[in-house]
């Protein structure tokens, strides 16, 4: 399958550990973060048991540190606890992680891994066509037809490289949320601003009145970690819950990771909390595109052709414009990018648009989008839908 050009490429890898059948091992090892792990608890583990387990794991690490086996390792660093998903990440020596994995409280362990951004194809200031396509039954129009509600009352979390929240196209609707990757609270890459401009910008966006929150999980080079992305998802879920936004929120994830149970679990927990998730399609069972309940998006060009670099398969919910998409860029600029990453925010924006227009809950959004979609995609891959995103404008 062709690799999409702007999807973030994650590689999840595992060490070979003796007698640890609950350790999820994968066959690629190039991007593993040495000695860094994500430990996922069983669903029946209570809050008290989770805290007791953390104390126990920390004690194991301190013992290894005294013995000189864990020099330079921090032990338990970050915990996750939202919507039934309990986990923690940390750096441990081999013997300690083997003991932790054998705990009766632990469901499985995955190696933490580097997140890398694939190369972007950029055509500066090219004409855009995506908004016209998603609001017309026939290809070729550049007019965007939409209801004036335009996502009003809906909040969209952009989990990405950050967002230039001061870009004039947002008109003050964008705010900074959290940064899990570095100390620079800005988009130094551009990808996150571009995707946000597509899902909610005033000029280039679908849901032009939605509120936007920047969740930075990748740095200027487009790199981060699985645990950092999960921190961003958890923060968004908790923020929505504590601010009365559950049921009125969406999340765009223009990123993915090679077949990851922990990533899928985090995405599913966010969806259960009352957030609609639009996710860029990946390659060979990428997560969270393979998670239950998320709306997985592949890419088409202006002629409704499935692009050669977009993923295909049964996990794809529908296609959306992803080739040569014009949107905003940091410092007041614009750029034209291509990729599945550009298709996903079109669907995220339509999801927010329909939530505002029809009052539907996040759990019903993807089905409603598929119901409205056009059977227009040409040459999709084997076992792949022909559905193309349409906002139901009637045009």
Curated annotation (Swiss-Prot):
Residue intervals of the Peptidase S8 domain: 128-395
Q: One cellular component GO annotation, for this chain's record?
A: extracellular region
Please list the residues annotated as glycosylated: 252, 391
In Swiss-Prot or TrEMBL terms, this protein is called Subtilisin-like protease 9
Boundaries of each Inhibitor I9 domain copy?
A: 36-117
Q: Which InterPro entries match?
A: PCSK9_ProteinaseK-like, Peptidase_S8/S53_dom, Peptidase_S8/S53_dom_sf, Peptidase_S8_Ser-AS, Peptidase_S8_subtilisin-like, Peptidase_S8_subtilisin-rel, S8pro/Inhibitor_I9, S8pro/Inhibitor_I9_sf
Write out the GO biological process terms.
proteolysis
- Which compartments does it reside in? Secreted
- Which lineage? Eukaryota, Fungi, Dikarya, Ascomycota, Pezizomycotina
């Amino acid at each position: 399958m062709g690799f999409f050009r702007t999807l973030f490429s994650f590689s999840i890898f595992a060490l070979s550990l003796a007698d640890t059948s609950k350790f999820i091992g994968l066959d690629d090892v190039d991007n593993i973060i040495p000695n860094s792990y994500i430990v996922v608890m069983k669903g029946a583990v209570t809050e008290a048991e989770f805290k007791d387990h953390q104390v126990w794991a920390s004690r194991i690490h301190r013992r290894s540190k005294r013995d000189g086996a864990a020099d330079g390792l921090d032990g338990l660093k970050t915990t996750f606890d939202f919507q039934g998903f309990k986990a923690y990440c940390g750096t441990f020596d081999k013997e300690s992680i083997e003991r932790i994995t054998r705990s009766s409280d632990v469901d499985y362990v995955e190696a933490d891994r580097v997140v890398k951004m694939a190369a972007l194809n950029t055509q500066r200031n090219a004409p855009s066509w995506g908004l016209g396509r998603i609001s017309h039954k026939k290809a070729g129009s550049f007019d965007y037809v939409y209801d004036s509600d335009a996502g009003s009352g809906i909040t969209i979390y952009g989990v990405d490289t950050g967002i230039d929240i001061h870009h004039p196209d947002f008109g003050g609707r964008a705010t900074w949320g959290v940064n899990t990757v570095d100390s620079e609270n800005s988009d130094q890459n551009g990808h996150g601003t571009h995707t946000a401009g597509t899902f909610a910008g005033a000029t280039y966006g679908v849901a032009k009145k939605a509120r936007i929150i920047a969740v930075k999980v990748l740095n200027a080079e487009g790199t981060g970690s699985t645990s950092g992305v999960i921190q961003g998802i958890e923060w968004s879920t908790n923020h929505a819950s504590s601010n009365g936004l559950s049921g009125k929120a969406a999340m765009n994830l223009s990123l993915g990771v090679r077949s990851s149970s922990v990533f899928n679990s985090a995405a599913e927990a966010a969806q259960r909390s009352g957030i609609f998730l639009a996710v860029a399609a990946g390659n060979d069972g990428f997560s969270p595109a393979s998670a239950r309940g998320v709306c997985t998006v592949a890419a088409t060009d202006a002629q409704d052709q499935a692009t050669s670099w977009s993923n295909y398969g049964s996990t794809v919910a529908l296609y959306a414009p992803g080739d040569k998409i014009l949107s905003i860029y940091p410092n007041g600029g614009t750029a034209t990018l291509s990729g599945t990453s550009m298709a996903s925010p079109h669907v995220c924006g339509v999801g927010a648009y329909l939530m505002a227009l029809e009052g539907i809950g996040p759990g019903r959004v993807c089905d409603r989008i598929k119901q409205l979609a056009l059977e227009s995609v040409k040459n999709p891959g084997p076992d792949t839908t022909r559905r193309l995103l349409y906002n139901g404008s009637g045009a």
